[in-house]
C-alpha cells in the first residue's frame, strides 16, 4: 500500500506557518517543525503582550499625573481623591494628556481638588 503524505492540506499548513515565521533567524524561518514552535511561542507572547500593554499604559498615565500633581503641590492619591470629591469624572488617560499638553488647565484641576480637600 502506498504512503499518504498529507497532500495539499499539509503544504498549505506548512506554508502558512513558514509565512508567519518570515524574518526569524536560521532554521526558525526555514524548517517547518522549528518554525511551528517559534510561531506558537510568538503568538502566545503577543497575546500576553496585548494584555500587558494596558497595564503599562495605566502605569505611564499615573506616573505623568503624579509628576504634574506634585509640581502643583499635591500627591497623586490626594489629587485623585480631591477630584472624586469634586465629582470630576476624567479618566487617567485624559488627565495624563492634560498634564503633558495643557499645564494651565491641569493646574486649575489641581486647585479644584485642593479646594475640596480643605
From Swiss-Prot:
Keywords: Ribonucleoprotein, Ribosomal protein, RNA-binding, rRNA-binding
CDD domains in the cross-refs: Ribosomal_L20
Molecular function terms, GO-annotated: rRNA binding; structural constituent of ribosome
GO biological process, one term: translation
A single cellular component GO annotation: ribonucleoprotein complex
Family from the record: Belongs to the bacterial ribosomal protein bL20 family.
Function: Binds directly to 23S ribosomal RNA and is necessary for the in vitro assembly process of the 50S ribosomal subunit. It is not involved in the protein synthesizing functions of that subunit.
The protein's name in its UniProt record: Large ribosomal subunit protein bL20
UniProt lineage: Bacteria, Bacillati, Bacillota, Clostridia, Lachnospirales
Gene expressing this chain: rplT
Amino acid at each position: 500500500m502506498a504512503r499518504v503524505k498529507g497532500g495539499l492540506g499539509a503544504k498549505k499548513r506548512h506554508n502558512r506557518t513558514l509565512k508567519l515565521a518570515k524574518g526569524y533567524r536560521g532554521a526558525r524561518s526555514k524548517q517547518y517543525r522549528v518554525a511551528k514552535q517559534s510561531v506558537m511561542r510568538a503568538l502566545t507572547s503577543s497575546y500576553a503582550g496585548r494584555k500587558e500593554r494596558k497595564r503599562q499604559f495605566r502605569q505611564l498615565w499615573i506616573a505623568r499625573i503624579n509628576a504634574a500633581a506634585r509640581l502643583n503641590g499635591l500627591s497623586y492619591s490626594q489629587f485623585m481623591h480631591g477630584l472624586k470629591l469634586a465629582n470630576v469624572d476624567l479618566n487617567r488617560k485624559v488627565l495624563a494628556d492634560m498634564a503633558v499638553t495643557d499645564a494651565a488647565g491641569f493646574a486649575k484641576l489641581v486647585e479644584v481638588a485642593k479646594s475640596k480637600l480643605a
